[in-house]
A protein has these predicted regions:
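N-terminal export signals
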Residues: 3-7, 13-34
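Carbohydrate-binding surface patches
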Residues: 57, 634-675, 714
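Polysaccharide-binding surfaces and accessory modules of carbohydrate-active proteins
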Residues: 39-54, 58-60, 71-251, 260, ...
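Conserved, mostly hydrophobic/aromatic
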Residues: 57, 160, 269, 377, ...
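Aromatic-lined carbohydrate-binding/catalytic grooves of carbohydrate-active enzymes
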Residues: 316-439, 453, 463-465, 470-471
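Glycan-recognition surfaces
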Residues: 400-433, 486-598
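Short Pro-Gly-centered flexible turn/kink motifs
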Residues: 264-283, 655, 710-718
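C-terminal beta-strand-rich structural cap/linker in extracellular carbohydrate-active enzymes
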Residues: 693-722
Length: 722
C-alpha cells in the first residue's frame, strides 16, 4: 500500500520481515518498491561502492547505493561453494542489514536516508575487520557497521556502533543488529534447530533467552547458517522466517522488543556499541565443515576470552556439602585432600565473609583470617579462589549505609530484596554508580587474597527464581525501567572489564544466578567473563540427579557453546560414583565438590592419576575443536547408554561412555565425521588396548563392551601416524 511516496506495511508483514518488530507499522523508502531485488539494485544507475570481508573459507560482499543504502550482495561459503544469496531472488526487505528506531524515526541500513561517510579495513591478530561508516541525512546520528572474520573460521561477526552527534540525548529501541535473507532452498526442505542448536522447531520462530545458537539448514544439501547471538541473557531475541518468502529464510538478530523491551539513551557526543552477532556457514555431514566441528572450534577460539589457550583448570569448591557452615578447621583438611587429587584451584564459597557486599573475613569461622588459608593452598601447588556476591548486599554494609540511593527499586519504588542463603539482602542497581563500588570491591579481594578465580554470584537484573526484573529508580544511569534491563548487563561487563584491565589472568565466573536464569549460558556471558557456573545439580546422594542430569545440561548446550566455559555443579568426588563423576567432569570445565576428607587414600590416588592423565591429554590435543554427543544424548535416561567424544582435528582425544542402568553389554560408537586415518583405542579405566580402527570402522560403529559390573568407560583416542 503506497502513501506519499512510501509503502505502508501491515503488522503481519512487519513481524514477518523483522523490520522494526512490533512497532505497529513500518515506513519503507520508495526505492524499495522500485528496486525490489538485489539484482535490480546491483544494476541500477546509482554510483555505489562495494567491499569484501572474508578469508579462504567465507566471503561477504556489502554494497552501498546512495538511493537504497547498505545491503549484503554476496554471502558465500568458500569451503563448500555454497551461495547463500542468489542474485535476482532476494527481496530488499529481506536484506535490511540492520534496523532500529531512534526517537520515533524508523531507520534501516537499506534506507535512502543514510549517506556513506567511508569505509576502513583493519587487521586483528588472527583476522580482519571492515567498518562501513554511515550518517543519517535527517538525524545527527552516525552508524558504523563492523564486520570481522577470523583465520580458519567460516564466520562473519558483526556489530554496530551508534554515535549521537546531536546536542541532546537520543533514544534507541527495536534494535536489529543483523537483518539478512539467505537462500537455502525450497521452504519445505529447510530445517531449524533452536535453543543451543539441538531442539528441532518449525522454521517460523522467535528465539528468546535460551536461543543462544540457532542452526537453519537445508535438510537435503546440509548447507546452513548457524546464528550465534552475543546479546546478553533475557535481552536476546532472534527472528527466523522460513515460511513466507519462497526460496528465502529471513534471519533477524536483535534485542528484545516485548517481554524485556530494549531501550537505550545515548548522550550528546556519546556512542553505544551493540552486542556482536556471528553467522557461521556449515554443511552437515561434510567432514570439518560439519557444525559439530565448526561451532565448538569457533566458540572456543573466538568467543571464549582465554580458556582455550591452555584448557580449563580443575576447580574444587566448598559449597556442597558445607554451605555457609564452612570454617578453617574444615578447610585445612580439604586443602590437603584437594592437593592430593591434583586440583588447580581451591575455592571457598559462601561463608568466608562477614557480610554480603563486604570483604571483611568472618572471624568466627576463620579466626586467623584467610592469609594462613592462602598460604596453605599455595603450599600444595594450587591457586586460591573465592565466592563474591556482586549486587546482593547486606543493608548493614558501609556501601549501603552511605549510598542507599544506589539500591534497585521495584515498581512501587520500594528497595528490591532478594532471598539468599544468608537471608534477605538488598539488590543494588548495576546501572548506577554502585558498579564502581562493586568493581573496587572485587579488585580489592583479588589483590588482598591473590585470587586466581572469582565466582561472581546472585541477583543482578533479577534472579532465577521468579523475582521481578529491572530497576524503577530515578536518578540512575537508566532513563526508565526498560533501559535499566540492558544497562544492568552493561554494568556487569563494566565490572569485569575493570578487573581484566588490572588483572588479565584472573578467571571470572559469572553464575547462572548472576545472569538471571536457570542453567543459562550464552555468548553474551562469554563476552563479559570466562566461565559460567551453569547449574547446581543435586549430587548429595548416590541416587541424586547427579552426573546423569549434569550430562543432560552438557549435551543440550555443547552444540554451540564452548564446553570448557561450563562449570556444571555440584558433582561430589566423595560418593561411590567416583568414575562417573570424573568421566562427566571431563566433558566440560571440571569442577568438583564434596567432603574430600572422607575419600580413601586409594580413591585420592585414583583421582590424581586420572586428572594427571587428562591434563596431559588436554595439553597435547586441542579437544575443544569438536563435541560429539553419543547414544541417548537428547534425553539422558537410566534405561539407555549415553556418552560423548571430544576430538582434536588430528583425531586425538577422548571418548566417555556411561552405561547407566541399561541392560545391554556393548555400546556401539559411531563417529562418521572422524578424520581419515588409523586410531588406537586405549581404556583409561583399565589400561588395556582395545585395538586399532580405521575411518570405515567409525562409520559402521565400534562396539565397546562393558564388563559385568562396569558402568563407565573412558577411552583415549590416539592417531597412528603412518
Amino acid at each position: 500500500m503506497r502513501s506519499g511516496g512510501r509503502i505502508l506495511v501491515s503488522r503481519r508483514e512487519l513481524i514477518r520481515t523483522g523490520a522494526l518488530v512490533a512497532s505497529g507499522c513500518a515506513l519503507l523508502p520508495w526505492p524499495f518498491a522500485e528496486a525490489s531485488t538485489t539484482q535490480e539494485l546491483s544494476s541500477s544507475a546509482d554510483a555505489g561502492q562495494s567491499w569484501t570481508i572474508g578469508n579462504d573459507r567465507i566471503k561477504r560482499v556489502v554494497t552501498f547505493l546512495p538511493k537504497t543504502g547498505l545491503f549484503t550482495k554476496q554471502f558465500s561459503d568458500l569451503s563448500t561453494q555454497a551461495e547463500f544469496i542468489h542474485q535476482g531472488t532476494a527481496p530488499l526487505r529481506m536484506a535490511q542489514e540492520f534496523s532500529f528506531e531512534c526517537d520515533g524515526h524508523n531507520c534501516a541500513g537499506s534506507d535512502a536516508t543514510f549517506e556513506l561517510l567511508g569505509a576502513d579495513e583493519s587487521t586483528l591478530p588472527k583476522g580482519t575487520c571492515l567498518a562501513v561508516r554511515l550518517r543519517h541525512k535527517e538525524l545527527a546520528l552516525e552508524v558504523s557497521v563492523i564486520y570481522c572474520c577470523y583465520d580458519g573460521h567460516p564466520a562473519i561477526r558483526k556489530h554496530l556502533v551508534l554515535h549521537n552527534a546531536e546536542t541532546r540525548a537520543r533514544r534507541i529501541s527495536h534494535l536489529n543488529i543483523e537483518s539478512i535473507g539467505v537462500a537455502l532452498g525450497p521452504a519445505n526442505e529447510n530445517t531449524l534447530l533452536t535453543q543451543y542448536g539441538t531442539v528441532p522447531r518449525e522454521t517460523y520462530y522467535t528465539g528468546r533467552s535460551e536461543d543462544a545458537g540457532l542452526l537453519v539448514a537445508n535438510g537435503l544439501s546440509g548447507n546452513g547458517i548457524a546464528v550465534l547471538s552475543e546479546v546478553p541473557g533475557y535481552m536476546k531475541r532472534t527472528e527466523i522466517d522460513g515460511f513466507y518468502s519462497p526460496g528465502q529464510v529471513r534471519i533477524g538478530v536483535l534485542y528484545d522488543t516485548d517481554l524485556m523491551p530494549f531501550e537505550r539513551s545515548i548522550g550528546p557526543g556519546e556512542a553505544f556499541t551493540t552486542a556482536s552477532v556471528s553467522l557461521v556457514a556449515f554443511r552437515k555431514g561434510d567432514g570439518f565443515n560439519d557444525p559439530q566441528w565448526l561451532l565448538p572450534s569457533y566458540a572456543a577460539e573466538i568467543l571464549e576470552r582465554r580458556i582455550d589457550r591452555q584448557g580449563p583448570p580443575w576447580i574444587y569448591n566448598t559449597w556442597e556439602p558445607f554451605h555457609r557452615k564452612i570454617d578453617s578447621a574444615i578447610v585445612y583438611g580439604l586443602i590437603d585432600a584437594a592437593g592430593e587429587l591434583g586440583m588447580d584451584v581451591f575455592t571457598i564459597d559462601d561463608g568466608w565473609q562477614r557480610e554480603y557486599g563486604d570483604s571483611a573475613v568472618n572471624l568466627k569461622a576463620f579466626p586467623e583470617g584467610l592469609q594462613p588459608i592462602l598460604d596453605a593452598v599455595e603450599a600444595k601447588g594450587m591457586k586460591f579462589g573465592l565466592w563474591l556476591p556482586l549486587a546482593a548486599i547486606g543493608t548493614s554494609t558501609a556501601v549501603y549505609r552511605d549510598h542507599p540511593e544506589w539500591a534497585a527499586l521495584d515498581q512501587e519504588s520500594k528497595p528490591k530484596i532478594t532471598v539468599t542463603a544468608a537471608g534477605p539482602k538488598a539488590v543494588m542497581c548495576m546501572a548506577s554508580a554502585f558498579r564502581e563500588a562493586a568493581a573496587a570491591r572485587v579488585l580489592d579481594a583479588i589483590e588482598r587474597f591473590r585470587l586466581a578465580y572469582v565466582k561472581l554470584d546472585l541477583t543482578t537484573i533479577f534472579n532465577a527464581y521468579g523475582e521481578a526484573p529491572g530497576c524503577w529508580a530515578k536518578g540512575h544511569e537508566h532513563a526508565n525501567w526498560a533501559e535499566s534491563l540492558n544497562r544492568i548487563y552493561e554494568g556487569i561487563a563494566f565490572v569485569t572489564q575493570k578487573v581484566y584491565d588490572k588483572h588479565p589472568d584472573v578467571l571470572l565466573d559469572l553464575t547462572f544466578e548472576l545472569w538471571g536464569q536457570k542453567h543459562i549460558i550464552d555468548a553474551g556471558l562469554l563476552a563479559a567473563g570466562d566461565l559460567d557456573w551453569m547449574s547446581n545439580v543435586d549430587d548429595s546422594q548416590p541416587n541424586s540427579a547427579g552426573p546423569l542430569q549434569a550430562r543432560q545440561l552438557l549435551y543440550q548446550r555443547a552444540a554451540s557453546m564452548p564446553v570448557e566455559s561450563m562449570l556444571i555443579g555440584n558433582l561430589h568426588a566423595d560418593l561411590p560414583t567416583i568414575q562417573e563423576s570424573f568421566a562427566t567432569a571431563i566433558g566440560s570445565a571440571p569442577v568438583i565438590l564434596g567432603d574430600l576428607r572422607k575419600m580413601s587414600q586409594a580413591d585420592r590416588q585414583w583421582y590424581r592419576d586420572k586428572i594427571g592423565w587428562f591434563k596431559k591429554l588436554r595439553r597435547s590435543a586441542r579437544i575443544s575443536e569438536s563435541f560429539f554427543p553419543l547414544g541417548s544424548w537428547q534425553q539422558t535416561s537410566p534405561a539407555a547408554w549415553d556418552g560423548f567424544a571430544r576430538l582434536a582435528h588430528s583425531g586425538n582425544g577422548v571418548i566417555a561412555l556411561f552405561r547407566n542402568k541399561w541392560a545391554g553389554v556393548a555400546a556401539t560408537v559411531q563417529l562418521p565425521l572422524m578424520p581419515a586415518g588409523r586410531y588406537k583405542l586405549t581404556s583409561v579405566m583399565t589400561g588395556k588396548d582395545l585395538g586399532v580402527f580405521e575411518t570405515s570402522d567409525w562409520v559402521r560403529g565400534i562396539p565397546i563392551t562393558f564388563a559385568d559390573a562396569q558402568t563407565v568407560e573412558v577411552l583415549e583416542v590416539t592417531a597412528i601416524n603412518v
